[in-house]
C-alpha cells in the first residue's frame, strides 16, 4: 500500500470512529419526557392559580400522578430511567465535584438531589392539599400552612433546577432542554 493510500484508509477509519463516538444516543424515553413535561406544566399552573379551587386540585393531583407513574416506571425500565440510575450518593457527588463536574449522559450526581427534592415536595403538596380538605381537619390551619410553605420551597427548587440545566448546558456545551424534548443526547465522552 502506498503512503497516501495508507493515510486515506487511516483517515477513513478515524472518521468512522469519530462518527460512532459522537452518534446520538437515546437517553430519555417517551414516558420520562411525557411525565417531565406534565409535571412541569401542572406545577407551573398550580403555582400561578393558587386559590385551591377545583381546577387547582385536579391539576395538582395530575402532577402528583405523573410523578408516581414515573417512579413506577423506574422499577421496570432498563435505560437511564431505571431506579439504579436514580440512587443519590454523597460519595459520588463529592467525587463528581472534585473531578470538575464531568459530562454525564443520564442524571449527574448533583442534579439527582434536586430531582428527589422536587419529587418529595410534589408528593407533600398532594398529601397536604388532600388532608386540608378532610372533615377531620376542618378549621385547622396547619395543613394549608405546610402546603403553602412547600409550594414556596418548590418554586425555589424549580428556579435552581432551571439554573442548573442552563449552567450545565453551558458547561458541557450541550443543549439539555432539547434532550428533554427529543430524548437524545450526543454520544462520546459519556460517563454512563
Ligand atoms: C404541584 C402541586 C401543587 C402546587 C404547586 C400547589 C400550590 C399551591 C399554592 C402556592 C397555594 C397558595 C398557598 C397560600 O395560601 O399561600 C395553594 C393553596 C391550596 N392548595 Fe395547592 N398546590 C398543589 C397541589 C394541590 C393539591 C393536589 C390539592 C388538593 C386538594 C391542593 C389544594 C390546595 C388548597 C385547598 C389550597 C388553599 C387555598 C386557600 O384556601 O387559600 N393543592 N396551593
Ligand atoms: C415546574 C417546572 C419543572 C419541574 C417541576 C421539573 C422537574 C424535573 C424533574 C423531576 C426531572 C427529573 C426527570 C426524570 O428523571 O424523570 C427533571 C429533569 C430535567 N429537566 Fe426539568 N422540570 C421543570 C422545568 C423544566 C424546564 C422548563 C426545562 C427546560 C428548560 C427542564 C429541563 C430538564 C432537563 C434537561 C432535565 C434532565 C436533566 C439531566 O440531564 O440530568 N425542566 N426536571
Question: Language-model segments: what does each one mean?
Answer:
Residues 1-192:
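Membrane-embedded alpha-helical bundles that constitute the cytochrome b-like, heme-associated redox core
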Amino acid at each position: 500500500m502506498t503512503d497516501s493510500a495508507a493515510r486515506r484508509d487511516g483517515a477513513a477509519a478515524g472518521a468512522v470512529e469519530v462518527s460512532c463516538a459522537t452518534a446520538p444516543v437515546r437517553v430519555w424515553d417517551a414516558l420520562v419526557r411525557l411525565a417531565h413535561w406534565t409535571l412541569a406544566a401542572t406545577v407551573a399552573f398550580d403555582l400561578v392559580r393558587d386559590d385551591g379551587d377545583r381546577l387547582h386540585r385536579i391539576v395538582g393531583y395530575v402532577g402528583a400522578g405523573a410523578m408516581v407513574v414515573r417512579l413506577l416506571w423506574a422499577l421496570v425500565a432498563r435505560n437511564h430511567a431505571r431506579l439504579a440510575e436514580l440512587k443519590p450518593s454523597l460519595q459520588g457527588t463529592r467525587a463528581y465535584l472534585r473531578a470538575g463536574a464531568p459530562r454525564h449522559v443520564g442524571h449527574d450526581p448533583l442534579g439527582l438531589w434536586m430531582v428527589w427534592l422536587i419529587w418529595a415536595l410534589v408528593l407533600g403538596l398532594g398529601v397536604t392539599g388532600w388532608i386540608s380538605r378532610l372533615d377531620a381537619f376542618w378549621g385547622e390551619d396547619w395543613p394549608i400552612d405546610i402546603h403553602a410553605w412547600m409550594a414556596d420551597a418548590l418554586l425555589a427548587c424549580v428556579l435552581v433546577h432551571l439554573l442548573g440545566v442552563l449552567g450545565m448546558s453551558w458547561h458541557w456545551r450541550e443543549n439539555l432542554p432539547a434532550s428533554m424534548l427529543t430524548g437524545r443526547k450526543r454520544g462520546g465522552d459519556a460517563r454512563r
